[in-house]
């Protein structure tokens, strides 16, 4: 006979303010099989857990139902409490009466009635629960970092420092990411290259770190502790083991007019190139779209001048397969495409530039050697207008993103300050909606731009930019003075919104990781697990999870590394016992379950069965690897014969819940 105990949590006032918890406990106490029911302000507290353990012993409970918050919050807490009292942890059910009840209802009577129904369903299910025992699986002591920007670099360095092997996969020819294109960092105006390049070199020289530059993740299989990853190393047409990075090939290549993506198309490069002087690895790459030798078999200059014999025109993509215990997504961001905003004339005038393009124009290693010149005629601009929030904080009717990009206010202040410092005769205007400076020393930095450098900050919107007579006619509004402004500018700089890298969606699909509506990776919990994805063993680092500046990115990178280290320190992991279980007598070998399994946990075997008249039959049936199965339940839905069931969530248990709800 089942002996169920019910414990209703107030969660302070989170539940109790909307749900009559006393009535819920009293009502559920009369359900069949329930021998004890009570309520308490905080069931997750030590006192609450002690109460559960005491009542298990006192009433010889065979099952426990906790009416509280989401099982994602405290299911493990309550399972461990019950296990200490000698009750199998899988004889515990959580009725979510906070997120699914009190938080979404205002009427107390309705919320209370719903809480009773949810509790009744949990009671019906727990009576059909069976004790489950978790198995173990070994942990591969190696980590994969997808993305080689500052987030990926810091994550890899921290993991390697703990003594674990780590691979960085970067799709571009060099690691470093967007930070390599930045001149100075706010609010201290440190040289970005002086901070970043030593870390890049550390990665290259660290024996525990292997860099797969100019490579992409092809596929991901397996599960936490045992991921199987295929990496595509794209053909550089240069042997990395032979190339010395001398640059002779890049100097002699006759194809000189290739748009230079590192300088955002503000100048050109050769068909064979090294992105920038401090690139890691410092290895040349041949651009197959522009190389005459690869396109029509004519040229070969780079091979002739390469004394190391590193040029290999026949090189092909290669696939590398590797096992990993943990994966970190550090895929970074891209500025939003600005040509969609016609009002700013970005695609009509070369003197309307993005903030990152302006960064390159101010950089000593940029296309103009750090001299600020207009792209159209090479003249020094006397009047510059900065426009904030281009593509950020847009409502549903506007083009762009609905979120704040977080870094635009600060880097615009930096650009304006550096411009005034270097060219005091330049008039600088900044049009803004709000100035957001929440970081340490950020507000002081912004005030310096206004008070010390005389930058004109105007609260208002730029309505239109019109190229006319060699000038940019800026039409804008000043909301504080309630007037319209017309400024003849020489340059307009647009603070472009940032969005996730284009590869993020495909990477998330391979990792079975969740994403929000803006294609940022979703964390397991925004407060308690901010660097973990809901997929076990997959962690988040940097702007793949949301907009952030460099200090915040580095901090999150180290936090993600700490989580990875904690995982790799273990010799084995406890497996989820709630795995799929096929009924071999009902299985017809159709492969439907195998096709939908995202983890590759299902295979098919030929098995002997005893037939009529002592005959032997060979039938093809499904077999589940419990170490790989993550208990998602996709196979149970797909199975046409009903042969596949899920431990802990069987069809019988789910129907018992449905019947209880409909009662």
Descriptions of predicted regions:
Residues 1-663:
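Residues forming the flavin
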């Amino acid at each position: 006979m089942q002996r169920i105990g019910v414990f209703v949590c107030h969660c302070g006032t989170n539940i109790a303010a909307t749900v009559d918890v006393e009535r819920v406990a009293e009502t559920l106490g009369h359900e069949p099989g329930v021998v004890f029911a009570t309520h308490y302000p905080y069931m997750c507290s030590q006192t609450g857990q002690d109460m559960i353990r005491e009542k298990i012993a006192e009433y010889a409970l065979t099952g426990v139902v906790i009416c509280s918050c989401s099982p994602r919050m405290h299911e493990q807490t309550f399972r461990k409490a019950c296990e200490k009292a000698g009750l199998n942890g899988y004889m515990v059910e959580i009725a979510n009466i906070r997120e699914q009840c009190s938080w979404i209802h205002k009427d107390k009577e309705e919320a209370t009635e719903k809480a009773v129904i949810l509790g009744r369903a949990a009671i019906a299910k727990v009576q059909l629960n069976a004790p489950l025992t978790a198995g173990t699986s070994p942990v591969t002591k190696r980590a994969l970092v997808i993305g080689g920007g500052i987030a990926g670099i810091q994550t890899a360095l921290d993991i390697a420092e703990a003594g674990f092997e780590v691979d960085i996969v970067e799709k571009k020819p060099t690691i470093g990411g967007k930070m390599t294109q930045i001149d100075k960092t706010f609010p201290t105006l440190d040289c970005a290259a002086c901070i970043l390049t030593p870390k890049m070199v550390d990665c290259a020289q660290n024996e525990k770190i292997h860099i797969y530059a100019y490579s992409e993740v092809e596929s991901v299989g397996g599960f936490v502790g045992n991921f199987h990853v295929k990496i595509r190393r794209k053909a550089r047409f240069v042997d990395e083991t032979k190339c010395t990075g001398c640059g002779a090939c890049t100097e002699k290549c006759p194809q000189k007019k290739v748009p230079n993506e590192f300088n955002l198309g503000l100048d050109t490069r050769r068909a064979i190139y090294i992105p920038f002087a401090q690139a890691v690895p410092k290895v040349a790459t041949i651009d197959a779209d522009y190389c005459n030798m690869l396109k029509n078999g004519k040229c070969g200059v780079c091979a002739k001048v390469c004394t190391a014999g590193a040029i290999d025109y026949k090189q092909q993509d290669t696939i590398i397969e590797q096992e990993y215990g943990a994966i970190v997504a550090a895929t970074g961001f891209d500025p939003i495409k600005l040509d969609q905003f016609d009002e700013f004339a970005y695609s009509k005038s070369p003197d309307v530039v993005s903030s990152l393009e302006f960064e390159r124009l101010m950089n000593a290693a940029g296309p103009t050697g750090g001299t600020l010149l207009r792209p159209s005629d090479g003249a020094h601009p006397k009047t510059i207008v900065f426009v904030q929030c281009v593509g950020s904080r847009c409502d549903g009717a506007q083009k762009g993103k609905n979120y704040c990009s977080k870094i635009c206010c600060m880097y615009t202040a930096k650009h304006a300050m550096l411009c005034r410092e270097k060219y005091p005769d330049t008039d600088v205007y900044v049009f803004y909606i709000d100035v957001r400076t929440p970081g340490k020393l950020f507000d002081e930095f912004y005030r310096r731009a206004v008070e010390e450098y005389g930058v004109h900050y105007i609260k208002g919107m730029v309505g239109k930019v019109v190229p006319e007579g060699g000038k940019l006619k800026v039409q804008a509004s000043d909301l504080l003075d309630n007037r319209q402004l017309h400024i003849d500018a020489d340059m307009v700089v647009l603070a472009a919104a940032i969005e996730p890298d284009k590869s993020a969606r495909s990477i998330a699909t391979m990792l079975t990781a969740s994403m929000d509506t803006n294609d940022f990776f979703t964390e397991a919990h925004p407060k308690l697990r901010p660097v973990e994805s809901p997929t076990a063993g997959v962690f988040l680092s940097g702007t793949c999870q949301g907009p952030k500046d460099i200090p915040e990115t580095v901090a999150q990178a180290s936090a993600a590394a700490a989580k990875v280290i904690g995982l790799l320190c273990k010799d084995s992991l406890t497996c989820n016992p709630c795995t799929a279980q096929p009924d071999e007598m009902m299985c017809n070998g159709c492969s439907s379950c195998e096709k939908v399994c995202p983890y590759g946990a299902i295979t098919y075997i030929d098995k002997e069965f005893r037939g009529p008249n002592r005959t032997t039959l060979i039938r093809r049936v499904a077999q589940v690897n419990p170490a790989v199965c993550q208990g998602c339940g996709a196979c149970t839905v797909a199975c046409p014969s009903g042969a596949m069931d899920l431990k802990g969530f069987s069809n019988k248990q789910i129907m018992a819940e449905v019947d209880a709800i409909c009662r």
